[in-house]
């Protein structure tokens, strides 16, 4: 009996010790977590009314908080042998937002420095930071596990020692989590109390946990992924005779909460919305063949399809609108429309004996079948030789690579703009169906389309739109002629180029004098000295005019002396030599003789050929106006002066002399029959000018006289 009583007493003490270990296990674990999260000042206030007690279980001294004693009443009075399943203890750590003012907002700053609203418009009052779960898992008898048996004297002490290691790990790990950092940051604000507070709540794990009015642990606040904002950690379990001790925690990784102004938070949200808008990547540039093709054609000479969407000119070129004032605008319109420049009907209008199958036929004048049908306006007929001989990779009537378009770009805009209007007016009527060109238009098309399209004139009236090579003029002409007749590719290139001279786009008419000048220059060899045909054979113009110098000086002196000697009556002097004989009264006082104007200024005022008729009419008008004036001198003096002047003037060759001398002679001859004394000649403005001007002016007069009379000069 004594043995049975001893064994029953030992088993009862073993059960009581096991129950104490289990009860203190739940209470000690809860106290360690709560004391690590609560503010020390708040913890002191809660302990102020109670006697300070220390909890030394599991070799860890902690404060005994009586505030959570009622919450842990179930687990403090538990009997492990009488309960089949023990509920777990859940300790939640949360952030309390109830003390925030209306103009304050809880924000969460992420790792990139962005702030996110965590109050959700004031509808939430708490944010769950951590959730601790403390439990004992007992073996299930239905699953074949061992039933609860009294702990032996050797098993319980070993389990207690393992629990000491577990609580030390729990105490350390609680101070490594983000919630501990938040609690230390909030407790450092000594000057002002933060409206944010961290609280803990003890819950029964066997009952459902509601998240109404608070932000749950699984709720995503920041703009990070769900797998990053929440993590879970479990401690190593400790086995006891009646089951297994387990502690686990789930916590938020980012607990960088702060209080911010509501208006500032609102503006930051707007900025964040703008930053989070998906940026549409720029679409790759769309290449338009119609815009890129013309540049390649002019640079590399690639094949280019022709179109008959625009009219065809008389010489085979496309009609240029009259409103286009520059080549650049015209080419831009050509690129936008995608049309080329040459039509198939240019061959028939260029003076050929039939329809042309291609551009080569239209330019060189070869006869062929009807116009080609591929890309040439849809005319019926078989394609010409140029179309049939093209390679399969090259489109019909493709442009042959050449440098004609590059050279055409160098043509000044003024030449093209001036000639484009006339070329357009002549070529516009050709596009009308059933129109029969007139003889004048056929002549223009025959000369401009067939001849000028192949051979480029070397000179023009402006002398600024063509390049002139004196040494290679004959060879270049032969080379162009051979390219025009013998090479179909050169004919196609010259006929299809819109900018090339002679294509109809530029209408050039060479004057006769320019062509004569070109012939004269071509006849001179590069090494030969420049010489002009002499006005008279065997005479030197320089020596001739040097001999006239003394006679001119003598005539000037005689006229000047006659004016000084005969001054009693006011003379009447002609104001101009251009045909108007206005008489002006001059003072009777003697005045010095002024220097006459230069002959170069008198060139535009008097023409020697028509002075006879003009002076005849002037003489009669002067005779009628001055018939009533008194005679101051005798007729003998007047006749003597006129005879001396006339004899002096007859000694000179007046054909090559200055126009002023010729005018003086005509005036003197018509004045000889007058019966009164009149000083009709002022100092002759051709006798006292510079010798160099006289020489140059006389040479030009001689050249004009020789060309008119064929070299027969009157002496």
UniProtKB/Swiss-Prot annotation:
Note one Pfam family from the annotation. Answer: ATG13
List locations, semicolon-separated: Cytoplasm; Preautophagosomal structure
Q: Which GO terms describe its biological process?
A: mitophagy; piecemeal microautophagy of the nucleus; protein localization to phagophore assembly site; protein transport
Residues of the region (Disordered) are 329-510
> Where in the sequence does UniProt note compositional bias of the Gly residues kind?
340-381
Q: A Gene Ontology CC term for this entry?
A: cytosol
Report which superkingdom the organism of origin falls in: Eukaryota
List UniProt keywords, sorted A-Z.
Autophagy, Cytoplasm, Protein transport, Transport
**What GO molecular-function term can you cite, just one?**
protein kinase regulator activity
Residue spans of biased composition, Low complexity class: 382-392, 414-432, 445-455, 486-500
Kindly give the InterPro entries that the UniProt entry links to this protein: ATG13, Atg13_N, HORMA_dom_sf
Q: Residue spans with biased composition (Polar residues)?
A: 458-476
Its quaternary organisation is:
Interacts with ATG1 to form the ATG1-ATG13 kinase complex.
Which family is annotated? Belongs to the ATG13 family. Fungi subfamily.
Q: What does this protein do?
A: Activates the ATG1 kinase in a nutritional condition dependent manner through the TOR pathway, leading to autophagy. Also involved in cytoplasm to vacuole transport (Cvt) and more specifically in Cvt vesicle formation. Seems to play a role in the switching machinery regulating the conversion between the Cvt pathway and autophagy. Finally, ATG13 is also required for glycogen storage during stationary phase.
Q: What is this protein called?
A: Autophagy-related protein 13
Q: Which gene encodes it?
A: ATG13
């Amino acid at each position: 009996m004594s043995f049975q009583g001893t064994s029953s007493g030992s088993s009862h003490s073993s059960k009581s010790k096991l129950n104490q270990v289990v009860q203190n296990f739940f209470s000690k674990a809860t106290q360690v977590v709560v004391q690590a999260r609560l503010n020390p000042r708040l913890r002191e206030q809660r302990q102020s009314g109670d006697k300070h007690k220390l909890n030394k279980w599991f070799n860890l001294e902690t404060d005994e908080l009586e505030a959570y004693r009622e919450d842990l009443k179930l687990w403090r009075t538990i009997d492990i042998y009488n309960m089949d399943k023990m509920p777990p203890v859940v300790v939640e750590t949360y952030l309390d937002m109830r003390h925030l003012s209306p103009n304050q907002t809880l924000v969460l700053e992420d790792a990139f420095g962005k702030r996110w609203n965590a109050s959700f418009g004031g509808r939430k009052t708490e944010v769950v930071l951590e959730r601790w779960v403390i439990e004992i898992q007992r073996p299930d008898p239905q699953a074949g596990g061992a039933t609860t048996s009294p702990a032996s004297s050797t098993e319980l002490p070993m389990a207690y020692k393992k629990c000491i290691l577990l609580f030390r790990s729990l105490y350390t790990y609680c101070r490594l989590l983000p919630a501990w950092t938040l609690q230390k940051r909030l407790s450092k604000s000594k000057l002002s109390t933060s409206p944010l507070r961290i609280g803990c709540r003890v819950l029964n794990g066997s009952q459902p946990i509601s998240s109404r009015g608070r932000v749950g642990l699984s709720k995503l606040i920041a703009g990070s992924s769900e797998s990053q904002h929440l993590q879970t950690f479990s401690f190593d379990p400790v086995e006891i005779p009646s089951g297994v001790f387990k502690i686990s925690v789930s916590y938020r990784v980012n607990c960088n909460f702060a209080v911010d102004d509501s208006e500032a938070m609102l503006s930051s949200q707007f900025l964040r919305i703008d930053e989070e808008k998906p940026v549409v990547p720029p679409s790759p540039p769309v290449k338009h063949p119609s815009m890129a093709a013309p540049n390649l054609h002019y640079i590399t000479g690639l094949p280019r399809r022709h179109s008959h969407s625009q009219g065809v000119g008389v010489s085979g070129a496309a009609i240029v609108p009259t409103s286009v004032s520059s080549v650049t605008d015209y080419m831009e319109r050509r690129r936008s429309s995608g049309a080329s420049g040459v039509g198939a009907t240019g061959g028939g209008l260029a003076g050929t004996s039939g329809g042309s199958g291609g551009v080569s036929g239209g330019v060189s004048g070869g006869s062929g079948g009807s116009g080609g049908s591929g890309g040439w306006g849809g005319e019926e007929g078989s394609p010409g030789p140029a179309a049939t001989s093209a390679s399969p990779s090259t489109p019909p009537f493709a442009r042959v690579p050449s440098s004609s378009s590059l050279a055409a770009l160098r043509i000044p805009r003024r030449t093209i703009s001036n000639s484009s209007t006339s070329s357009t007016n002549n070529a516009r009527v050709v596009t009308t169906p059933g129109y029969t060109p007139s003889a004048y238009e056929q002549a223009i098309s025959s000369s401009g389309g067939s001849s000028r399209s192949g051979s480029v004139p070397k000179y023009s009236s402006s002398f600024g739109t063509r390049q002139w090579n004196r040494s290679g003029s004959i060879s270049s002409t032969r080379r162009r002629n051979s390219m025009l007749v013998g090479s179909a590719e050169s004919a196609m290139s010259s006929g299809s180029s819109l900018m090339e001279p002679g294509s109809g786009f530029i209408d050039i008419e060479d004057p006769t004098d320019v062509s004569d000048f070109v012939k004269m220059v071509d006849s001179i060899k590069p090494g030969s000295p420049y010489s002009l045909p002499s006005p008279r054979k065997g005479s030197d113009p320089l020596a001739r005019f040097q001999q006239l110098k003394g006679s001119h000086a003598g005539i000037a002196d005689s006229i000047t002396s006659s004016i000084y000697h005969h001054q009693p009556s006011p003379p009447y002097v002609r104001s101009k030599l251009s045909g108007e004989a206005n008489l002006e009264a001059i003072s009777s006082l003697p005045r010095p003789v002024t220097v006459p104007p230069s002959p170069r200024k008198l060139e535009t005022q008097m023409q020697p050929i028509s002075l006879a008729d003009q002076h005849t009419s002037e003489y009669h008008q002067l005779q009628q106006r001055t018939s009533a004036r008194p005679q101051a001198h005798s007729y003998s003096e007047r006749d003597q002066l006129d005879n001396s002047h006339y004899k002096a003037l007859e000694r000179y060759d007046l054909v090559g002399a200055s126009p002023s001398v010729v005018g003086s002679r005509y005036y003197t001859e018509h004045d000889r029959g007058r019966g009164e004394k009149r000083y009709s000649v002022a100092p002759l403005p051709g006798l006292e000018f510079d010798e160099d001007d006289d020489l140059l002016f006389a040479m030009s007069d001689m050249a004009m006289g020789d060309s008119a009379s064929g070299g027969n000069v009157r002496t």
